[in-house]
Every structure is written in structure tokens, then in C-alpha cells.
Amino acid sequence: MRSHTATMVDRIEDTSRADREAALADAGHNVFELASDDVAVDLLTDSGTGTMSNDQWAAMLQGDEAYAGSASFEDLAVAAEDVMGFQHIIPAHQGRGAENVLYGAVLSAGDTVLNNAHFDTTRAHVAANDATPVDCPVDGARDPDTDAPFKGNFSVERARRVVDDVGADAVPVVVLTITNNSMAGQPVSIENTREVAAFADDIDATFVIDACRFAENAHFVQQREPGYEHDSVAAIAREQLSYADACVMSGKKDGLVNVGGFVGLHDDGRLHEQCRQRGILYEGFSTYGGMSGRDMAAFAVGLREAVEPPYVAERVAQVQRLADALTDRDVPIYQPAGGHAVYIDANAALPHLPREQFPGQAFVCELYREGGVRAVELGRFAFPDTDRRDLVRLALPRRTYGPDHLDHVADTAAAVCERGTDVTGLEIVSEPELTELRHFSAALQPVA
């Protein structure tokens, strides 16, 4: 039984297949351009799309909208320290704002940034600072059929080879993303976190944890890592984050809110002051950072709710339920399932399409055409010039959809797979200059 009830509902508009085909064509076969009213089940992202609790809504009514010295900011700062262990935060309007604040302070042209796997905005921020993003996944991370408990881990061995090549002075930042969104939402172990921290210390680099899904990662540690089975999710999260010098946090994930983020730091030294000044310049004064007081109030409550055992266990179980439903219908997926999403293996589902015709994006379009399901491609289209598989992410908004919605998604995906060779590939018609973010706004068309 779910640990919560619904006190407000949102109507799903009914659309015909003809309606969806017309909408898809108007959108340039890019589902980011679809109107939400034209979508039946929206699994584009879990970022800021979830359902807030009544306690969060109650906190919003008491939000302090003061420009400086907001009591709501103080509530958020206390929650960040209590839950995540960071004594100092620089608020931002969302995670990518926090990335801009932090990476702009620590990167210079010609630098190299090591990460277990850069996600799209992180990769773009690194590139925007004329630095080079390098992924260091462990062996087997890219194999959708390999069964391992922590496929999101960071390969220190691979990272050392990069340092040997470019020099330690060229690597000012080492990033660990938990969970590893680009590698199908796979978790990272505490043991690996310690290893990465020691490696960063060895090369005198700032160790940053991208903590957007820290609570989901802590749940996996509790379930899979020996020695942590009796520890609480809250205690595990605090330990894992304690090894980092800084964190980037998006409240739109494990903050359980619709907007907001921050840079977290353990001390108030030079990096803190640099980030504070950049925050004021780009995000707003250091006690709001682009958030309203009511948003900060809800964020403070959401951080505490994210590590509550019933919530996080139910969250991960719902993702597993969707994975099981897809597997039961012979839809090829990345195994094991992650904590926030299920990833369909489009290369296996549509083997007749060459990678140049974007099988992942083709599958995304067919999901929408077939059943009004919006997903996102995370493969050659989203990450050009990489060797990542063509995956289709089905990201579940938190506390939002029920079993019947998941069954509809699974049935729709199965119907796409059954059509097989009838699915046509795509080609790009136009794309932005910053190709790291092309999947947000590029236009495509079916291959003739």
C-alpha cells in the first residue's frame, strides 16, 4: 500500500493518434517542443515534475519573501546541514544554476574535468568554460545486460590514465554523480566514493558530488553494500556526502520541489567566497539565489522527506515495477533498473536502424505517437561525439503516477517493439551551435 493519499488531481486530456501525429510533426519530432496538454503520461524528466506533500504546501504559506536575511533561507540552510552535512550553501534557481556558479569558479580554459559520467548540462557547463569533460565509468557500465550492484561507480584506474596523459595541474575538479543519470541511473557505492575522494586528494583537485539524487543512491547503498544494511538512509547519505569538498544540488530531484538548487560547501574559505560572489552576480542575493521564499520553505521540508524510509523505498520500488512490466512484455531495458527511471535499450529494440538515424529518438517519437507517452533519448542524439548506447529514459515524477499509468507505458513500449522494422529513422534538420544541448531544441524529420 502506498504511504500517501492524493488530495488534488490533474486531468489527463484524451488525444487521438491523428492529433499526436500532427503535434509531433509540428514539434519537429522533438518531444521537448510538445505542449503538456498533448501528453498523456509525461516521463520526460523527474526534475521538478513531482507532487509535493501537504507539509510542503503548508510551509509555502509561511514563506519569507525578504530580499536579504530570509527566514526561509535559514530553514533551507539548516535542512541542508542536517540532511546533507554541508554547513554552507549558495542558493540557485535550479541545479544548472548551481553548476554555473561552481564550475565558473574552479575551471579555466584547457582544464579537464573527470566524472563517472557527465550529464547534459554538466557537460555543457564544462565545455562553456573551454574545458574538456572526460567520462570515467567502470567496466560494464555501458553494457545493459551486465548484472552488478554499483554500475554507476567511478573508475579511478581510468581517471589515473587521463591524469598521466594531461597532468594533474590540468585536472582541478573531479566529479561524482549520484546516482549516475547518464549510466541509466545506476548507484555509486560508499567504498567507491572514498576511493574517488582519495584520488582527488592525491592530485590536489576539488572533489564535487553531484547530489541531485543522493537519497535514492543512499537507499541502494543500504540494500546492496555490505556493512550498511542496518544503517538508515539518512545516515548513509550524510556519510557519502561527507567525503566531498562541495556538492551541486538540484532541489527538483531529491529536494522534492518544482524549482531550486544550491552549491553546498563544508567550509567558508576562498571557494565559498568565489561561489558567493558568482551567485550574487548570476542567481541573486545569497539568501535567495533566484528562489522565492515559499520555494525555499518547501525545499527545506522536501529535503527531510526525501530520506524518510517509506518514501524512498516506495520511490525505488515503483521504478522497479515499471522495469518488471517492460521485461514481462519483452521490451529490452538496461539492467538493473535505477532509482528514478527505467532505460529502454533502443539499439536492441530497433536493430534495423543505424546509429546515424538516431534509433533512441525514433523510439521516443513512436512512444508518443502510439500512446501519448513522452520520454527522452539519452544516446547519440543527446550526447554527440560519444560512444554511449542509444537509451530511452522513462523518468518517473515523484509521488505522481499509479500502477495503471505504468501499465499503459509498458503496453505502449511493447506495441512500438512489435512494429519493429516499420519504425523509421530520423535525421537532423537544424540544431543549435552548442551541440551539447542540441536535444532540447534541434528539429528532425523522418529519413526518406
From Swiss-Prot:
Keywords of this entry: Lyase, Pyridoxal phosphate, Tryptophan catabolism
Please name the pathway.
Answer: Amino-acid degradation; L-tryptophan degradation via pyruvate pathway; indole and pyruvate from L-tryptophan: step 1/1
Q: Which residues carry this modification: N6-(pyridoxal phosphate)lysine?
A: K253
Please report the organism this UniProt entry assigns to the protein. Halobacterium salinarum (strain ATCC 700922 / JCM 11081 / NRC-1) (Halobacterium halobium)
Where on the tree of life does the source sit, at the highest rank? Archaea
Gene that specifies this protein: tnaA
Q: Which NCBIfam families does the protein's record reference?
A: PRK13238.1
Q: What is this protein called?
A: Probable tryptophanase
The UniProt GO MF terms for this protein read: lyase activity; tryptophanase activity
